[in-house]
Each structure stands twice: as C-alpha cells, then as structure tokens.
C-alpha cells in the first residue's frame, strides 16, 4: 500500500512521457487530505542541489505540506533559473488542482542531471495523476513504481503503532547512494496527530541512523529528499518514544531495501565497528571500509580479503579514530580472519554463499562505542548499468 497505508492520504502514479522508456510510469502524486498537513524533511548535502530540492526546502520550512509531486526521467539539476521556474510551475499546477497554495506543494525529481524537464508533459501528467488519485493499495503501488529509475523493484514500508495509528512509505534508490543522503526520493506518511517540530526531530535522528549509513557506490546525488507527512486522520496522538521508534524503523527498512536493490549487487555488506572511542570514530572507520572498491570487488568474487579491510581502515586519521592497529580484529561471517592486526584463521573457512556478508571490526580501545554501515559489492553488472544509463 505504500504511502496510502496511513489514513488521510491519496496517491497516483502515471505515465507522463517524461522517461525515455515508452509507457513507463514516471510521475507520482501524493496528497495529504488532512485534517492536519504537518511536514518535515531532510535533503541532500550536495552543493549542486537540484531545483526541486531548492524549492522543497522552502516549502517544508514552515512545517506544512499538502501534496508532493515526484517524477523520474529527469533530475532538473544544474538547470539554473529555468529549472527552478519549472519546479515553481509544477507546484503551481498541483496547487491549483487540489485547492492549495504553491508553497504547500513539494516537488521531487530524479534522473539525468543537466537537462530541463519536458514541462508540458509534467504539467499534463500532474492533471492525469490528480484524476487518478485514490486511497487504495493499488494507487500507492503505482506511485512507488513511478519514482523508480534503475531500481528493479519498488521499496515500501507499512507499520502500525500499538494503539492503531499507522506509518506508510516509499523510497527509490539503487545507485548513486552514499552517506549524507543520496540519489533517493522518499515519502513517509502517518495518520498520527503530531507536530511538525516533533516530526522534524524524529526524522533527523532516523535519517542519521539509516539513510546516512548506507553506501552503494560512494556517489552523492544532487536530488535526494526524504519527506515525512502527517494527516492526523487517525485522531490518535502517539506516545513520543513510540513515534520516534517507528519513524526510525520505517527509515531503517527503506534504507535496507535500497541496499538490497543496489545496482548489479550480488552481496549486501554489513560493516559493524565496535570498541571505538566514540560513535563518530566507529562511523568514520565503517565508512572508510564501505568506500573501498577493492574490497567490494573482492566480495563480489567471494573473497573475504581482510587485507583490503584493514588497509581501508588505516586511512582514517588517528585524531578522528584513535586505536592501536596491533589490537584490531576482523571477523567475516563469524570467522576471525584478522587477529591483533595480523593473519587469523584462513579466509577459505568463511562461507561467502549468503547474500549478506557481515564484517565485524573490533578496535579494542577499551571503550565500547560502535556503529554500523551497509554497502554492496561491485560487480560487472554495476559497470554495465552505469555505462549504458540514460534517463
């Protein structure tokens, strides 16, 4: 059901002729029917942020969003004033259709960078999507398909609070995924009665521990956007801790689905660093290992090459993550192949047949801070997808 799982939301996904793939659904519309229109958002940290990101940041700033329109088939990034004008025109069209103000409408785009969108197609698609709006499971599924690019499957989540309020969500993302958000568009909906301030606080923490801790290929997008919308249609004001927990669970589920659909990936790699002096230190170490293309290639070949793990680990400056390299241990899928900074058990003992590969690194500093990041292996298929990619 995706974004329509929570009460008070309708959605649609249509083929607007934006994508180069004929007949592909490429435009989604999500409308919050209230009674609340509270909203929160987090956006890309890329300095070349796209026009729709610039627009949507302003929209979300006041904590109110009545609708989100999303397109695949073009990023509308690095398109200057003309691109920004397209985002404004899109918001104005949707606002007119639903009886709202333009600054109540967020705009999201994904696809090829550097080209303007076919605006006539976008605006006509917005009208078609408005006519197709429904609060059904099928409508939510259509919306999740419409935002896909190199994704092989839609990614959705549905959760229910202890007293009946709900969270639903959808995300797109398969490649160009790196920490600090990436090329993903995510819309999460809830029918809980919550304030925009509470939502922003919950989303910021949830994103930091989910979307900001995945890395498919080390490439940061210009367009990533995560929006959390509340309709209040359940009439239920949830326990604050439970609300925060379910938002975090929703983000964790969606981010893991991105890793599970990484472009061409044959292994999902979980890297957990323990025994660090701080969580930031553990995170820096985990990200350094996750960024190693040499390691990703080795994992693709079913080779748990611990030398590539520790060499990447060693690039983290000591002032960022102090540790003694002679005390570091590395386990892969439960087998300790690096002991005290040197060889441990033979790496041929590691079972590499599961889809998930677990790399556990203990810095043994005497402290107990830890962090986990996820990444994928690097395959021939990844190169093929990105050599041939066009929106």
From Swiss-Prot:
GO molecular function, one term: L-glutamate N-acetyltransferase activity
EC code: 2.3.1.35, 2.3.1.1
Site note Involved in the stabilization of negative charge on the oxyanion by the formation of the oxyanion hole, residues: 110-111
GO biological process terms, semicolon-separated: L-arginine biosynthetic process; ornithine biosynthetic process
Catalytically driven reaction(s): N(2)-acetyl-L-ornithine + L-glutamate = N-acetyl-L-glutamate + L-ornithine; L-glutamate + acetyl-CoA = N-acetyl-L-glutamate + CoA + H(+)
Matching CDD domains: OAT (cd02152)
Positions annotated to bind substrate: 149, 172, 183, 263, 386, 391
Stored Pfam families: ArgJ
Active-site residues, as the UniProt record annotates them: 183
NCBIfam families the UniProt entry points to: ArgJ (TIGR00120), PRK05388.1 (NF003802)
Protein name: Arginine biosynthesis bifunctional protein ArgJ
Gene: argJ
